[in-house]
Amino acid sequence: MAGRISAFLKNAWAKEPVLVVSFSVWGLAIIMPMISPYTKYASMINKATPYNYPVPVRDDGNMPDVPSHPQDPLGPSLDWLKNL
């Protein structure tokens, strides 16, 4: 089986090297995101980054879910990124 595949690849490379290279690049483009550590860390950063940022509001003391200052740390932190 491996002999047939290698013979096919040698023949294809001899006749159409552009197609062989293009299919190889396509295969790497499909496989690399699954095995890349960049994908793992990018998804961790996206989970920790808020989608909506706090709007400055006048706090009357009855809003426990609104931070007193927009830069107050709330939610998941990115300390793991600093410790890489």
Curated annotation (Swiss-Prot):
Pfam families: NADHdh_A3 (PF14987)
Annotated transmembrane regions: 19-39
Subcellular location(s) of the protein: Mitochondrion inner membrane
Entry keywords, A to Z: Acetylation, Electron transport, Membrane, Mitochondrion, Mitochondrion inner membrane, Respiratory chain, Transmembrane, Transmembrane helix, Transport
Positions of post-translational N-acetylalanine modification: 2
Record's bilayer topology term: Single-pass membrane protein
InterPro entries per record: NDUFA3
Gene Ontology CC, one term: mitochondrion
Annotated region (Disordered), positions in chain: 59-84
One of the GO BP terms on file: aerobic respiration
Function per UniProt: Accessory subunit of the mitochondrial membrane respiratory chain NADH dehydrogenase (Complex I), that is believed not to be involved in catalysis. Complex I functions in the transfer of electrons from NADH to the respiratory chain. The immediate electron acceptor for the enzyme is believed to be ubiquinone.
Quaternary structure and partners: Complex I is composed of 45 different subunits.
Family membership noted in the UniProt record: Belongs to the complex I NDUFA3 subunit family.
UniProt protein name: NADH dehydrogenase [ubiquinone] 1 alpha subcomplex subunit 3
